């Protein structure tokens, strides 16, 4: 049984953000621009937080192959150590990042509750830049807000 997972990326800073929005971004663990987190879509309260911060973030459903690449390239262990195949074998009993991504998607490993992996990923700005305005919603020709499967192409440009 695979669960729907949201990859949430912060795309704007916060100088003019309302205090409620700042607190929401903090609760989502999106403390800096280009930080990303992965949460199950059915997490209680997540929809409200996404709606409140939608002008500062973009999100969508992540694919298994993209999650595996994100863990391999940008995943960090406590102490800011890079994730290695030996480390994930010791902590999770899996042989590859693809197997770990499969366990996360199936709900056997809950990424935001893990102590063995940092709960956020620090990304680069997208290669080639944002194609549209970060001030407008995605459905209106911008970059912010819900974007569905298109989040995968964006995050691959940010690794």
From Swiss-Prot:
GO molecular function: RNA binding; structural constituent of ribosome
Keywords assigned by UniProt, alphabetized: Ribonucleoprotein, Ribosomal protein
Domain of life where this protein originates: Archaea
GO biological process: maturation of LSU-rRNA from tricistronic rRNA transcript (SSU-rRNA, 5.8S rRNA, LSU-rRNA); translation
Pfam families: Ribosomal_L30
GO cellular component: cytosolic large ribosomal subunit
Family designation: Belongs to the universal ribosomal protein uL30 family.
HAMAP family reported in the protein's UniProt record: Ribosomal_uL30_A (MF_01371_A)
Subunit record text: Part of the 50S ribosomal subunit.
Descriptive protein name: Large ribosomal subunit protein uL30
Species in which this protein is naturally found: Ignicoccus hospitalis (strain KIN4/I / DSM 18386 / JCM 14125)
Organism placement in taxonomy: Archaea, Thermoproteota, Thermoprotei, Desulfurococcales, Desulfurococcaceae
Gene (name only): rpl30
């Amino acid at each position: 049984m695979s669960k729907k997972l949201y990859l949430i990326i912060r795309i704007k800073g916060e100088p003019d953000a309302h205090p409620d929005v700042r607190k929401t971004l903090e609760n989502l663990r999106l403390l800096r621009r280009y930080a990303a987190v992965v949460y199950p879509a059915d997490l209680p309260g997540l929809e409200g937080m996404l709606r409140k911060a939608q002008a500062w973030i973009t999100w969508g459903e992540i694919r298994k192959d993209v999650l595996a690449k994100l863990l391999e390239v940008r995943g960090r262990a406590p102490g800011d150590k890079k994730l290695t195949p030996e480390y994930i074998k010791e902590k999770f009993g899996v042989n590859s990042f693809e197997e770990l991504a499969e366990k996360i998607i199936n709900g056997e490993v809950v990424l935001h509750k893990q102590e063995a992996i940092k709960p956020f990923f620090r990304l680069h700005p997208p290669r080639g830049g944002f194609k549209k305005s970060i001030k407008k919603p995605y459905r209106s020709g911008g970059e912010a807000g819900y974007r569905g499967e298109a989040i995968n192409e964006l995050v691959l440009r940010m690794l």
